[in-house]
Amino acid sequence: MSRTETLDNTKMTNGPITRILLSFAGPVLLGQLLQQLYNIADAAIVGQFLSSKALAAVGATSSLTYIVCYFCIGSCIGISVPASQAFGAGKNTDLRKYFINGVYFALAIAVIMTAVTASMSGLFLTWLKTPENIFKDAHVYLVIIFLGLPLTVLYNFCFGILMAFGDSKKSTMFMAVSTVINIFLDLFLVVVVKWGVAGAAVATIFSQGIAGVLSAVYIFKKYKLLFPVNADERKFHPYYMKNIIKMCMPMGLQYSITAIGAIILQFYVNALGEDAIAGFTSGYKIKNLILCPLNALGTALSSFVGQNFGAKRFDRISEGFKRTLEIGLIYSVITMIVCFFTGRYMALIFVDAADTVVVGYTVKFIRYISVFNAELALLFTARYSVQGMGYGKYSILSGLAEMAGRAAVAVLLIPHFGFDAVCWNEGLTFLAGIAVILPIYIKLFCHLRKSMI
């Protein structure tokens, strides 16, 4: 493939919108399901082969790993927006400069975040008042996950680049390979070698590293037009770095700001005891799995909007928004019905049936959150559309609203209503985010359509 080739087969500016969105979202969904299988394998193996105490230890780290890992993920995936806009507009020189400056940005994120988080992990757990009987295991798990952040950055930067091209199939294939490795390595290190929670953490980061390396090799071989052809394209460019930071940092902050609310929530869940922590942990794993299709649709929509924004096809952006929301709402109704009738069976994936209290907490959480999926479909559709147009900074406002919602429920309701309030948290949080991001999308879309056409 020559450097000037436009890769028309990955363009989203022409053709049937629903088919494009679903064909792109399909591999992304599979990749996200595989990513969740990572987490489910860890939790299921730890819960079934170690103990509910070990599961609680892993669960006690979830909000911390969420805020740190998702800051890195959001920051790295953010490169897909300026890259997709340059690609959609046919500006390959700009595309190469965004790519190389994105590499510099990702390296800085990896080094800084690893050094800070790994050295402060014990202090973080102390601030969260992690129960003493699970503190040691939680600390071991957290340190290993944080030391593996460079591998998380590698995979998600490559994922962001592939999303810019509308190429979601290969990254999914690589994730499938690493997921199989993760499950077998999990079983080997936890069950055979007896490394405990440390084995689960090592399996996770090693396997993600495999996906990252495979993705990087694939990009190097297929997308030759990304790589600089002269010294000017290889050097640091303040203009391109500024645009990358303007897009990537808000996305990273939006993910992490939302997670700050989750940390406050985790603080109050920890106060409810070991059984509540284990139930919340297993319920949250299932929730993340159920929400994968909505995330995949949002990711597809972001790339779709980015390319069509670059091509000034606002008619397709509007139609893409409507089609994505319709699909999301249909899916939400289906999952609500499924969760109500199969919640107990889902809980038994993680928890022994003899742990009746933990099973009860898990089932209650699953059934509650399934009611709120329709809200999340609207939230994701609006948020990913705003990000695709290159205005990720406004996602921070939505993230702040969600953070405030989580914090308010945790502080005001959990002390009085206990675990029930933990379950209500999701719905109230989503409503807060919608109240902010939906008006922003409508105003932005109308303004940009008038000014650019």
Where are these regions (language model features)?
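Short alpha-helical transmembrane segments in multi-pass integral membrane proteins
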Residues: 1-25, 83-148, 192-249, 305-372, ...
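N-terminal transmembrane alpha-helices
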Residues: 12-50, 63-78, 82, 107-114, ...
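Transmembrane helical elements of multi-pass membrane transporters/channels
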Residues: 23-42, 144, 155, 178, ...
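Helix-terminus/linker motif at the lipid-water interface of multi-pass membrane proteins
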Residues: 37-56, 125-132, 188-195, 256-285, ...
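Interfacial/gating helices of multi-pass transporter permease domains
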Residues: 46-66, 132-137, 197-198, 240-247, ...
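Small-residue-rich hydrophobic transmembrane alpha-helices
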Residues: 55-115, 152-171, 279-343, 376-398
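Hydrophobic transmembrane alpha-helices of multi-pass small-molecule transporters
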Residues: 67-70, 114, 182-186, 212-216, ...
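Short runs within selected transmembrane alpha-helices of multi-pass transporters and secretion channels
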Residues: 76, 144-163, 171-179, 200-215, ...
